[in-house]
């Protein structure tokens, strides 16, 4: 058996091929797993569990079917869907996890997270993240009418796209010291995350031993998952 990890699908109505590919994944590979972990940015945007978007309900039903089949499903918030709440979690049968979670998998101690907190060189983003994660601000935003939230979210995405276009690729990648610090804090040899859209397996030194950072790819033109078994940790890309 295997435990599966995915991230950065950025599901939206404008990308039906990705949605179709995810549905096939849920109906196939996911049903064979010991567990499925979604490490953030499942959706391109999330403005509240009360959003009647048909795509959200379609995805909730599909994930719930996996959960009901006996495969537990877990979710860590990303930078796009950090407002996804308990209502959607119940509807989809997912368990919400904290932003950093340590798993014991087949004899390995593995830290999982979305990955944006590791990009500490991007000071502008980290300041923005700290602001929008304030509970009082989230409560205020979610109390606004849905049409107002949609306008704010659209403007924020446009501003983010403009800001990122002028940033260097290095700034938007993880900071190596932040990686080592997180792994040593949790005393792990393995780290699995998404966010950067730079799929790879990196070898490093943490806790005075060889350690590994596995980065999930985004679902742009193909699927990406990490498959952990008793024998191996594999980064796998597959057609939709």
Curated annotation (Swiss-Prot):
GO terms for biological process: lipid A biosynthetic process. Mn(2+) 2 binds at residues 41, 79, 114, 195. Its EC number is 3.6.1.54. Mn(2+) 1 binds at residues 8, 10, 41, 197. It comes from the Bacteria. It is found in: Cell inner membrane. Pathway: Glycolipid biosynthesis; lipid IV(A) biosynthesis; lipid IV(A) from (3R)-3-hydroxytetradecanoyl-[acyl-carrier-protein] and UDP-N-acetyl-alpha-D-glucosamine: step 4/6. One of its GO terms (molecular function) is UDP-2,3-diacylglucosamine hydrolase activity. Transmembrane segments: none annotated. Its main location: membrane. The keyword Isomerase does not apply. It catalyses: UDP-2-N,3-O-bis[(3R)-3-hydroxytetradecanoyl]-alpha-D-glucosamine + H2O = 2-N,3-O-bis[(3R)-3-hydroxytetradecanoyl]-alpha-D-glucosaminyl 1-phosphate + UMP + 2 H(+). Keywords: Cell inner membrane, Cell membrane, Hydrolase, Lipid A biosynthesis, Lipid biosynthesis, Lipid metabolism, Manganese, Membrane, Metal-binding. It holds the Pfam family Metallophos. InterPro entries: Calcineurin-like_PHP_ApaH, LpxH-like, Metallo-depent_PP-like, UDP-diacylglucosamine_Hdrlase. Binds 2 Mn(2+) ions per subunit in a binuclear metal center. Disulfide bonds: none annotated. Substrate binds at residues 79-80, 122, 160, 164, 167, 195. GO terms for cellular component: cytoplasm; extrinsic component of plasma membrane. Its cofactor is Mn(2+). It is an enzyme of class 3 (hydrolase). HAMAP family: LpxH. Hydrolyzes the pyrophosphate bond of UDP-2,3-diacylglucosamine to yield 2,3-diacylglucosamine 1-phosphate (lipid X) and UMP by catalyzing the attack of water at the alpha-P atom. Involved in the biosynthesis of lipid A, a phosphorylated glycolipid that anchors the lipopolysaccharide to the outer membrane of the cell. Belongs to the LpxH family. NCBIfam families: lipid_A_lpxH, PRK05340.1. This is UDP-2,3-diacylglucosamine hydrolase. The gene is lpxH.
